[in-house]
């Protein structure tokens, strides 16, 4: 559960980043594929080259999902229910990959929003992304 102060930190940081969702989401995915090559197996049908339209489009989906989550702190389970079903039952994504992507998202935010990426914002965003990962893996059980 995020505190009110953490919600404010996430809202402020994600508010700045969300306007660059496609760019930041694509960069996070590219970092994911470079740092953790086994994650590419879920995207074998994608053009994984730098700047590909498919990576940008999926990056935007990731960013949009995070915007949805940030808009529903107290009802994230319902807000992300369909996405959780998709990843658990159709795509069958290994749950560890959400944590790996969360790490890459933090790196991208630190790179692009250094002034806003304070230690407290970092901690709040990490907690938020962990909550998102928990919600997305809740249907695996």
UniProtKB/Swiss-Prot annotation:
GO terms for cellular component: haptoglobin-hemoglobin complex; hemoglobin complex. The modification Phosphoserine is found at residues 49, 138. Coiled coil: none annotated. The modification N6-succinyllysine is found at residues 7, 16, 40. The modification Phosphotyrosine is found at residue 24. One of its GO terms (biological process) is hydrogen peroxide catabolic process. SUPFAM superfamilies: Globin-like. The modification N6-acetyllysine is found at residue 16. Pfam families: Globin. The keyword Acetylation applies. This is Hemoglobin subunit alpha. The gene is HBA.
